[in-house]
Amino acid sequence: MSVEQHRKEAPKTVRCMILTISDTRTYDTDKSGALIRELLEAKGHQVTEYQIVKDEYSQIQHWLKVAAGRADIDAILLNGGTGIALRDTTYEAVRDSLDKEMPGFGEIFRLLSFQEDIGTAAILSRAIAGVRDGKAIFSMPGSTGAVKLAMTRIIIPELGHVMREILKDR
C-alpha cells in the first residue's frame, strides 16, 4: 500500500497533549506552546491537555507516564529542553521512555534547520520522536522558529499517518 493510501486512511483528528519544558516560561509567556496549539487546531486536531513542566528528568518522565495512561491522548508534543546545556534533560527523559524511536524525525528536523533556519548550529538540536504505549511523542526545541519548522514541515503533515501506523495492529 502506498504512503498516499496510508494518509487517506489516517485519522483526521488527533488528540494531543502539549508539554512546554521550561524553568522560566509561564502560561502567559509561552509563545511556543501557544503556537503548537494554534497550528494543531488550525488543522482540526484537538488539544486535550497543556502543561508547563520544569526541565527536570523526573518531572518530564512523570508527565509522559500520565499521558501514556490516558485514553483521551493520542500524541504528546514537547517543546524545550532539547539543547546540550546541563539543565536540558528532555532528550534523555523522552529517549528513556520510548518503546520505539523514530530517528527520521530528528534527522529531518536538523537537516531542515541547517538548510532553512540556523545553519551549522543545527548540530546542537536533540529533537527526538517515537512511540510509547501507543502514543506518538514528538520533542522539539523551544524557540518559536524551531516549533514552526517542526510543526509545519514534519509533524502536521505526518501526524495522522503516524497514528495510523501505531494503531493499525491494535
Swiss-Prot record:
Keywords: Molybdenum cofactor biosynthesis. PANTHER family: MOLYBDENUM COFACTOR BIOSYNTHESIS PROTEIN B. GO terms for biological process: Mo-molybdopterin cofactor biosynthetic process. Pfam families: MoCF_biosynth. NCBIfam families: molyb_syn. Belongs to the MoaB/Mog family. This is Molybdenum cofactor biosynthesis protein B.
